[in-house]
Amino acid sequence: MFRLSKVIFIILLIGGLIMLTSCREEKTVKKSAFEYNNLIGHGVNMGNALEAPVEGSWGVFIDDEYFKIIKQRGFNSVRIPIRWSAHISDDYTIDKNFMERVVHVVDKALENGLVTIINTHHFEELYQDPDKYGPVLVKIWEQIAEKFKNYPDTLFFEIYNEPAQQLTPDKWNKIYPEALKVIRKINPKRIVIIDVPNWAHYSAVKDLKLPDDENIIVSFHYYEPFNFTHQGAEWVTPQLPVGVKWEGKDWEVEQIKNHFKYVSDWAKKNNVPIFLGEFGAYSKADMDSRVKWTETVRKTAEEFGFSLAYWEFCAGFGIYDRTSGTWVEPLATAALGK
């Protein structure tokens, strides 16, 4: 009886070890880029803060509580634009205090259960002289990748926001793989987002040459029609007249669907997930038009299986009023869908 009990015990022990190993293997099953893209879901950009020359100089300082507010509202993710190039020394080392500020912001976003995307944003010199500053972008990413190498897989990297001007499609297709290469040396499996050229315009997806990398997501931005979304914007030259409406007419909706289908067809052909990294209409447009446009863009992105992030949280395009501590409705609902 003792010998039989011992045999049974050993069998149960082996069975338990097999089950434990199986559970561990299940926990470490690699998600596909499409599954990670689904985790982005519905997000919002923390715009006008860390991508300003100095945080706060454009009116927005990221408070820790913002991430709790965003999560409780139902958003899945945040995209954090960052102007690293304003905080580097002559040898391109990132300022320690600025790096720690970014770390703090990322930590707070992740602590609140938000998928977090960090990028390089407003690297103006790169736009004008990509041959000279492309290697600087690589150096910046080497430091970022090292700093965040042990972070969870819900932190994503986005190499650069809206390549354009002298950073032509041809130049971009040569520079971004070099940044990706240094990221992969330190973060071999982390999701990396790559913007399409020409200000991340939907029509430029065809100009992006994809790398042999299964852990990437491709991103485009959507501000069409531009004379509606950017009417009255002070930074646009010449300044666009105010008063342009978007009424949700059949032809207006169809235009958005056609643009998104163009992106979707390319994505299916190349088997890559799509992230609509920015979309929004400036506050100089009337609220009714903004709500209709935002809701239509969001719904169309959902129909095509794109993840998305509204531009932006609490500034000129914002869906949250910092002064009153309330959501701007019905615009926030239009951006999120609930």
Label each region the model flagged.
Residues 46-64, 84-95, 229-255:
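Acidic/histidine-rich helix-loop elements
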Residues 286-338:
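Aromatic-rich peripheral "rim/lid" segments of glycoside hydrolase catalytic domains that contact
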Residues 1-9:
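Bacterial N-terminal signal peptides that target proteins for export
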Residues 138-250, 257-281, 303-306:
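Active-site region of glycoside hydrolase catalytic domains
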Residues 24-79, 92-93, 266, 334:
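N-terminal carbohydrate-binding accessory modules
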